[in-house]
């Protein structure tokens, strides 16, 4: 972890034109879309996600069969099948001038 935290990202941001002041990204890992109403499931069990004014990626397919590997391949830039952990979704947002927070349970 110490080695990873010392690695610098390689992002080059050419333009940032944010439409909104605040962006919220919710990652519903370990959940099947057919069990959630907002994603086409049969139950009305996601009232907030079903009504929120946002972009929902309902057709995403996990990059791997395990959560850890799937998120590593999804949230990081991948070169030759290997995640570049320093070049990830959060470092890209930071490089673009956004403040970021990570909440996890």
Provide a role label for each language-model segment.
Residues 1-25, 30-105:
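Active-site-proximal alpha/beta segments of enzymes that process anionic O-linked groups
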């Amino acid at each position: 972890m110490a080695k990873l935290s010392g690695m610098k990202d390689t992002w080059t941001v050419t333009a940032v034109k944010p439409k909104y002041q605040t962006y919220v990204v919710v990652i519903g890992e370990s959940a099947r879309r057919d069990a959630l109403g907002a994603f086409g499931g049969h139950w009305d069990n996601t009232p907030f996600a079903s009504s929120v004014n946002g972009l929902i990626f309902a057709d995403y397919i996990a990059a791997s069969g395990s959560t850890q590997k799937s998120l590593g391949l999804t949230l990081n830039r991948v070169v030759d099948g290997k995640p570049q952990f320093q070049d990830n979704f959060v470092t890209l947002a930071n490089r673009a001038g956004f403040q970021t927070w990570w909440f996890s349970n």
